[in-house]
Swiss-Prot record:
Protein name according to UniProt: Trigger factor
InterPro entries: PPIase_dom_sf, PPIase_FKBP_dom, Trig_fac, Trigger_fac_C, Trigger_fac_C_sf, Trigger_fac_ribosome-bd_bac, Trigger_fac_ribosome-bd_sf, Trigger_fact/SurA_dom_sf
Cross-referenced PANTHER family: TRIGGER FACTOR CHAPERONE AND PEPTIDYL-PROLYL CIS/TRANS ISOMERASE, TRIGGER FACTOR-LIKE PROTEIN TIG, CHLOROPLASTIC
Gene that this polypeptide is encoded by: tig
Keyword terms, alphabetized: Cell cycle, Cell division, Chaperone, Cytoplasm, Isomerase, Rotamase
Lineage: Bacteria, Pseudomonadati, Pseudomonadota, Gammaproteobacteria, Alteromonadales
Amino acid sequence: MQVSVETTQGLERRLTITVPAESIDSQVKSRLQQLAKTQRINGFRPGKVPVSVIKKRYGQAVRQEIAGEAMQRNFYEAIVQEKITPAGMPNFEMKTDVDGQDLEFVAAFEVYPEVEVKDVEKIEVEKPVVEITDADLETMMETLRKQHATWKEVKRKSKKDDRVTVDFVGTIDGEEFEGGKAENFELEMGKDRMIPGFEKPIVGAKAGEEVVADVTFPEDYHAEALKGKEAQFKITVNKVEGLSLPKVDEEFAKLFGVEDGDVEALNAEVRKNMQRELEQTLKANVKEQVIEGLLANNEIDLPKALVDQEINALREQAKQRFSQQQGGNVDNLPELPADLFQENARKRVSIGLLLGEIIKTEELKVDSAKVDALIETAASAYEDPQEVIEYYKTNDELMQQMQNVALEEQAVEVLLSKANVKEVNKAFDEIMNKQA
C-alpha cells in the first residue's frame, strides 16, 4: 500500500492510497471461487459452476464489493501509519479500479486541530462569597406562602394584585364587535393580560359597580379588524378576591414533608435547600466565567464535521423539547435551519477541544468521589434519591455521562487554580435573581 498525504486547506486532508493489483485481484478470485461453490445456475450441478461463468455474471459486483472493503480497511491502516486522527467520516473517491491494475482512491476528511491552551493566568474570575441571612430565609418563606396562597372573596375596593370576576361588553363607534363580550370573566389584575387601559378603571371598584374603559387596540393586535381601533368597554364587577396567605404553622410545615409539623425543622430544611441551590448556582457562575475566559484567550480552528455533528445534536434536542412541551410527533416537525444552532455549536465544540487538551496535558483521571457527588446532587431533587442513585449506577450510558461531567469539572478546577480569581461579597438574592 502506497500513501500520500496532502493538506488542501486548513484542517482538510486528502489521502491518496494505492493498493497493489495482486491484492485486489486475489481477493476477487477467492470471492468468486466461494460463490462458485454455493450458487445454483441452470445447466450446472451445485458446486460445479465454472469460475469463468461466475465471473461473467457476478464479477463486476464482486469487484465493487472488494474495492469498497479495501477502501475502508486501507484507509484505517493508512491513518494509523501516518499518525492522523480524522474528525468525522471520510469521503471516498475512486480513481482507478480495473482488473490487473492497482486500485487507487482518494479519502478526503478533516483532522483535529493542534490545540495549545494559553494565557490561562489572564482569565479573570469574580468568585462570589454569599451568606444566607435570616432575612433571606424570611423572603423565601414568604415566597413559599405565596405559592400556596388561595383566593378569598373580599368586600372592599379592588387592588392591583386582586382577582376580579367581571362582565364586559365592548363597542366600536357604538356597535358591538366579535370577541368583545364576556360574562363572569376571571381577571387576575396586574398581569397585563388584557389590552392597555382595560384594567385601569377596575382598580378601586367594588363588587356590583359598573365602570367604563376607553382603550385603543394595539397596531400588532392579532385580530386584523381591530388593529389600531378605539373601543369602549362597559364593565360590571361581579366579585373581588384577594390572595390569602397561609400561616407558617404546623399544617404549613406538613405541606413540605415535615411530618411532625415542626416549624423550626421546616426552616432548617428550607435553609438547607437554599444552600444547595446556592452552591450549584455559584459553581455554575464561576464555571461560566472560566469557560468564557478560556474561549476569549484561545481561538482555534474547528473541523466542520464536528460543528455539523453538534448542530444535528442541538437540533434534535430542540425538537424533543418542543415535542414534550407542545405534544405531537417530532417526525412531523419542520427541519430547523442550521443557522439557529451554528454559534452555540461552534462554542460547544471549542469548549470540548480546549477542555480535552487540559485533561490530556494534566493527565486527569476520573475522580470517582466527584462522580458520586454529582449523582447524589442530581438525585437530591427527587422524592426517592436512593432509587435514582441506583438507577444511575446500573445504567452504563448515564454513568459515562456523569464521568464526562466530572472530568470536565476537574479540568475547570485546574484552570481556576491558575486563573486570576478575586472574591467579591454578594447578596443571596442578587446571585439567585441573576440566575433566574
